[in-house]
């Protein structure tokens, strides 16, 4: 019965297909193989999209949607793009998270019976971009696969991640706990995530385009074997990946998908890096966001720490900087080696110094991405010429590095890495023209002298004019026809033209080709032979050039690993040189490291803020076992958050390997950096501002260790005063007594300034400010001891709050101060007045009420006064001021 049903279904499908034209049958077959992908179907000079694909592309790419004819009774909707401009349209699609299958004509239209043979040669997806037109120069694009591991009870026990930068061939693996997935994805920022049904729900929203792949692709045993095959090894022990489980399963799925999209092997994926959580300083999503490492809180790329540090001369260096900022090593050994290299670059003699080195680096091409395209056989002519010119410049660059490498082991290692693969430069120099065309199809790519056949074909095509001149001269002499001409047109090709009055002199070997009113056109055997050669020479030259170019790409494949080594060395050298330039230009110093717990920063500065203002006030920060928590008070806008962030940024920069903005800095071990600064509603997640705040605080309290640096800014402000105060007090105590981490704790709760009395490891500091008239001047200096008020009204006035509101607030504040003094209630926060202090006894009786002049001033509204009324009021106030409160009462 089942067989009959299958046969019926096949017959129905065959009947339906027969109703379509042969070309549409071909298209529909290809589309059925890529149902979730937009198929770009090559037709002559255009890529066409049909039916639903056409409608979608027209909407996303702003294309004209047309309708031409019908197939099987269905109108054919079409939209198309020129083949030479397809990359810009693909770039737009990728930004929308869409994928495209590029279907090319692979058959010869002249010999095809029916539709020209076509097939999909590559699939462009958000995570598999390699073409320069689709990539940002300074950002990597990652394809990530996610595999959930389960224990014997079927509960998720770990998550394996494998992510690939297809443009460079860098492959990384990691295994982590399920609750760490969000932080890992925030750090990696994949453009595309591969997941099987049942695990897609594990992916937080907004983390990249999600692609469903079959569950069997994630088989762990198959994935392990596929990794071994890809890396051409018998075991993964040398990469530290043999003990991995779910990560190897993820790697297997990733390699299957990536190879399928490219339609070929991934020849440049030849190494593997296993990332362990303990290897890097932990930075959770909140910390990355609040420290504005690579993106501001407003979502812009500048001003950030990345934008400040990125003076790299190559795109490779800029991309490496982004990676280093998000992966600061915990071990100080790597940072110290980088500091040593920076010092050597700064101390180098002028002829081999920093400026000379950076000038040479500016001539370097993006070797990393060119190598990726080489491995995928998609490198274009100018990629190869750029690679050739870069390799030609490497000997001089190596000499500069060698002159200063004796003072830094890291530079010596990089100098060795900059040696081009043997034979690679020679091949590129011989094969590629000095200034090749952009595309092989345009010709002029292969250098003269590389291939004799190509040179001959070019000579025929290029020397055509001279041959015709020589032939015309010879024929005039042979025939005695002085006005004989040898010419060419597209309709009749080459011909010899003779006027009617001279036709009696035409030799017997002339064959008539065309008769005109006043002339006859002929062709000779010699001219016919030349015509056959000339007309086909250019076409044959282009075909020969294409074949030779493909041969060059194949010949370069054995050099892929050597090119990758050079690219890695260039990127690191460029980044270290950029760090040195920043240190010299911005007056930064080399930090020191110690095994003792502590952070000491002398005259530290916020690197990004300092670059935005004319003058920046430097401040010290000292944290050690006797001083673990700083309670930071002071006015709003006084600089508390800036001081906290600059401490974290200076620590991060030190471990990344950069010099730091300070007079001196010394750091003990740091394992994680936490921030709880600012908050906003998570509407999508159904969480209020206070809930977000408490969630971040909980993560800190649960995970911070004695080696962690914690920034807490105004915790507890999202609820009632007493609740917030109680929470802030308890959190600060817990950080001191249990976590014992380095903590900067900013607050407006005055009661917390009493904490050092209970915990000697806590200390009070404040950001100073002075009142000037009714305004305030922020000094931005960190001083010992607590602040006594927050200057909230003055800050509101600076912010542009209307004057009537400020006056009303000032009046109500005076009322609250009187009420507070009368009831002797404790101060709840720094917006209130300072606590009442017992004054020594004096002979004068205390004032029972506020001064009458002040009361009169608070009653009036200056905006309602006429000039005459204002003058009268001035005399009245003068009189009240001369008399005391007692006189006024009398």
From Swiss-Prot:
Which residues does the annotation say bind ATP? 634-641
What is an example of a GO molecular function annotated in this UniProt entry?
ATP binding
The residue ranges crossing the membrane are none
UniProt keyword Cytoplasm present: no
Q: SUPFAM superfamilies attached here? A: DNA repair protein MutS, domain I, DNA repair protein MutS, domain II, DNA repair protein MutS, domain III, P-loop containing nucleoside triphosphate hydrolases
Report the GO terms under cellular component: cytosol
Q: Which HAMAP family match?
A: MutS (MF_00096)
Q: Which organism is it from?
A: Burkholderia pseudomallei (strain K96243)
* InterPro entries the UniProt entry points to: DNA_mismatch_repair_MutS (IPR005748), DNA_mismatch_repair_MutS-lik_N (IPR007695), DNA_mismatch_repair_MutS/MSH (IPR017261), DNA_mismatch_repair_MutS_C (IPR000432), DNA_mismatch_repair_MutS_clamp (IPR007861), DNA_mismatch_repair_MutS_core (IPR007696), DNA_mismatch_repair_MutS_N (IPR016151), DNA_mismatch_repair_MutS_sf (IPR036187)
The family database entries (Pfam families) matched by this protein are listed as:
MutS_I (PF01624), MutS_II (PF05188), MutS_III (PF05192), MutS_IV (PF05190), MutS_V (PF00488)
Q: Which Gene3D superfamilies match?
A: 1.10.1420.10, 6.10.140.430, DNA repair protein MutS, domain I, MutS, connector domain, P-loop containing nucleotide triphosphate hydrolases
What is the protein name stated in its UniProt record? DNA mismatch repair protein MutS
According to its UniProt entry, what is the function of this protein? This protein is involved in the repair of mismatches in DNA. It is possible that it carries out the mismatch recognition step. This protein has a weak ATPase activity.
Read off the PANTHER family from this record: DNA MISMATCH REPAIR PROTEIN MSH1, MITOCHONDRIAL, DNA MISMATCH REPAIR PROTEIN MUTS FAMILY MEMBER
Keyword DNA damage assigned to the entry: answer is yes
* UniProt entry keywords in alphabetical sequence: ATP-binding, DNA damage, DNA repair, DNA-binding, Nucleotide-binding
Q: Which family does it belong to?
A: Belongs to the DNA mismatch repair MutS family.
A GO biological process of this protein is: mismatch repair
